[in-house]
Each structure stands twice: as structure tokens, then as C-alpha cells.
């Protein structure tokens, strides 16, 4: 008879969880940020609100975003006029879109990740699917399993309604799954479509306008497992540790409520201040065991909630401007895609590191940090170790 200890030992992987492939996808409809205020106020029948439009124009100008991608185009919005109002019953129409489109966009990203990984999809043992766009049963995880033709025995975890920190959460969960299940290969998918949050402007809730200026659609997929098969699987980053915390005195700073009118977001003005004030504590706790206290010695992946968050974190930690290059690049090219952002940034970083002939996937640096920020205020902190580029 074997003992529980022997079974337990046999179940565990030897090495750390490793990112082995990354894929991303966006809808075809690209929106230019410079002309977006004109389009937004026209499509929502709000052109008479001239002062509000000027405010929105300033928000868009300050957003540091050049373009975004959105499933919602003029045709779809004209068919669903209630989505263009500020507070009209529209959840059914929104759900009809996202329940179908979220798994589809997720599939596009997953297909790219599986291709890069180079292994048959039958070897995927676990699926973690994350979205803040809509809710359904069976979930988007089930729909994606069908769309990809994964094995019916794939072990699924569906994360709905987490918000912008969840790109860190999925890495934390995938790390535990990979390291505690020998041979596990975890497909992680974050897919976000703003059809659930899009709404017309109002004078009374300017925080809602902030979201309209920042949010974009996108999906990212990664494959994570321990003990990569030599010559077959190519490691990109190792996941060394992962932590989650709720910031003190931050209740109500970022809230989202799913109602008849869709998903409404509410932000307090001091979100950037709350994050920047507390970010060093999370860094210290994560990197003290490694003997690292110079934040400029790390490579950086931070959820780009908005430019003010990045500016204040940069200032608070005296980061060199190049530290947030990959993060700002993704914000500029795609906007805030909620949970998918940090995975887009990981992809951008490894791509640019190789292109620039650097020694590692982490901009030539050995150790790095990935931050997710979102409702709660919740912060996810993931310690990454880069891999040498041959």
C-alpha cells in the first residue's frame, strides 16, 4: 500500500510554474482616440451637451491612448439604442452580445498561444477563464472548451466579475495548479468586451465618463506549466511568488455593479493616490525574501488602469521612465482592457526584448514584478523571473 505522503509527492511538480506561450486578439473595429469624442457624442445623441463634450475631449487627450479596439460599432449601437443612453434597461441586449463574443475572442487568443506552445491541445489539463464582461451558465469556460475542442475532462475554473486586478489573479491560480499537479498544462484566458459597460454621458457622474475614455476590448491567452519539456516547450517567464491584498481605507474606491442598465463603474478621485501610497509595501513584502530593494533593478508590468496611476507610481518609487515603457505602450495601443492588459504587456515585453537583442525576456533583466489593481481596492503582486534569450 502506498502512503498519502507518497501519493502527495508524486502529484507535485519539481520546478516553478513557467509561462510557455502567449497569444492575444482584438476585435477588427479600431477606434481612433483623437476623433472618439465626436463619434461618442454623436452616437449617443448627446451633441447638445457641449460643455460635457469638452470635458470628455480633455479626458481623451490626457488618456495617453492613441487607439482602442471595440466590438461595438455604429451598426450594433444603432440596433440597440438603449445601450447609448446613460441609464436605460439594456442588460438583455448586452448579455446577448458578450455571452457569444467573449468566448469567441478568447478562442482567437488561445489558438495563437497553443500554436506557439507547439503541443497538441489534448495535453491541456486545466482551463482558467476570466472575464468582467457578462455572466452565463454554463460559463465562458465551457463555451471555450467546446470552441477549441478541448477534452471534456479538462478541469475548468470560471472567474466572473473580478475587474482589472484579475490578470494577476489568473497567474496566481495557474501557478498553484501547475506546481501542485505534475504534468499539468494550464490554459489561461482573459477576454474582455466593453459592450457591458458602454453607455451615454451624464453631467451627474463624471466617473462613468472616465471609463468611456479608457476601456477597450481584448483577449489574451497564456499556457503555464512546470518542468518544461526540453527542446519541445520554450519557457518565457517563471512565476516565483504571488500575493493578493486589500488596500487600507480604500472601500468604494473602485466599484462595479451589474444591473438592468448593464455594468456601471464608479471611481473615487483618489484611486491613483491610494495605489501609489501602498505600492511600496507590496513590493517590499514580495522582494525582501530575494534581497531586492532597488525597484529600478526590476522589469515592470503594471496594469495600466489609467495614466494618472502610472505617473504617480513612477513618481512615488522614483522609477526611471523606461521601466514602464511596455505598460505605457499597451495603454497607448489598446486602452484599458481590464484583466487582459498585463498579459498583453508580458507579450509586448518578451517580443521587444528579443527584437532589441537583449539577454533575457525581461528587457535583459533577471527579476521582475507584475501588478494588478482593481475593485476592492485589490492589488495582485506577482514576482517573475525572466528566461535567457538564446
Swiss-Prot record:
Catalytic site: 164
Q: Name one Pfam family in it.
A: Chal_sti_synt_C
* SUPFAM superfamilies according to UniProt: Thiolase-like
CDD domains, A to Z: CHS_like (cd00831)
Q: Which UniProt keywords apply?
A: Acyltransferase, Flavonoid biosynthesis, Transferase
Q: What is its EC number?
A: 2.3.1.74
On pH dependence, the entry says: Optimum pH is 7.0.
| Top EC class of this enzyme | transferase
Family annotation (InterPro entries): Chalcone/stilbene_synt_C, Chalcone/stilbene_synt_N, Chalcone/stilbene_synthase_AS, Polyketide_synthase_type-III, Thiolase-like
Instruction: Please give the pathway this protein is involved in.
Output: Secondary metabolite biosynthesis; flavonoid biosynthesis
Which GO terms fall under molecular function for this chain's record? naringenin-chalcone synthase activity
Q: How does activity depend on temperature?
A: Optimum temperature is 35 degrees Celsius.
Quick check: keyword Magnesium in the entry?
no
What reaction does this enzyme carry out catalytically? Answer: (E)-4-coumaroyl-CoA + 3 malonyl-CoA + 3 H(+) = 2',4,4',6'-tetrahydroxychalcone + 3 CO2 + 4 CoA
BP GO annotations: flavonoid biosynthetic process; polyketide biosynthetic process
What does the UniProt function comment say about this protein? The primary product of this enzyme is 4,2',4',6'-tetrahydroxychalcone (also termed naringenin-chalcone or chalcone) which undergoes enzyme-catalyzed or spontaneous isomerization into naringenin.
- Name the family: Belongs to the thiolase-like superfamily. Chalcone/stilbene synthases family.
Please report the name of this protein according to its UniProt entry: Chalcone synthase
